[in-house]
Amino acid sequence: MKHWINRSLAATAFAAGLGLAAALAQTPVTFQLNWTAGGPNAGFAAAVGEGYYKAAGLDVTVVQGNGSGNTAQLVASGRSQLAYADAVAISQLISKGAPMRIVSTVYQSNPNSVNALKKTGIKSLADLKGKKVGVPAGSSQGPMLPLLLKANGLKESDMTLINMPVAAMVPSLLQGQVDAILGSLDAYQIQLEMQGAELSNFPFADHGVPTVATSIFASNDFIKQNPEVLKKFIAASLKGWSFALDNPAKAIEHVKTLFPDVNVKLATAELAAITPLFCSGGAKFIGKAEDAHWTRTQALLSEVKLLPEGQDPKSYYTNEYLPADGEMRACK
């Protein structure tokens, strides 16, 4: 009996040792978001909460952001290694020599929009002439504005553009300090509607600017030094997004657990708003770049000098680190 007990204790100790070793083997990864936590980050929160990262041997810390432009600069400057931001903001820096690359295209079209209160009488983009338009500092909408204006026969001089802090956008519109804002269907638009505002909304994608958007990207050093970690991170993240699309309420619970200050009602509405973006434009798989989408994006952005003409779109992105098609969620 004594031998059995000793063997049992030894086996228990061995198992505990394996568990400890597994815990110690977790690779730490810091993931920089483009924005404050909410519905647009639900897939990553689900990957944490459902244990997908942990099962892949990753100990992931998710850090909130303050605009895609700022997040892209963090990676370009080497202050962050792995992040999530608008593809246009990322591509602009890559075209200028920033050592980084998009490794998973998550939004197949952009959520940007112009938002105006109906009472202002703005019924079309042409009605922005002579108006004051709020532009969120450090975000992706500002750099893309020239493209929207050109596609609709407008110029920046037709209106007064006012750069302002992100937190000031919604109150400035509601208080009449600006007539319209450069917003997003997954952010300001929802916040305004939840406060009872009656809006006229003009999505960029429906007004001549159907560009690819929010994507996972990494520094070239991180990609080169950690290719297997990157593959595991992307696979677990896309699994998290698949879970979030199937279980939105539970995914928002995971967001709330990670970031207790999150407004559940708002985050739920945000997740519902972005859901169509994952498979828009005929995309075949969630998270996989479509060459045609990127070719169109390159052509549009080069028209207004946001990207250089003649650039190979594949210099901005790669699908090399994605799971095999059979392991990815297909778009229906």
Language model region names:
Residues 225-306:
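Secondary-structure end/capping motifs
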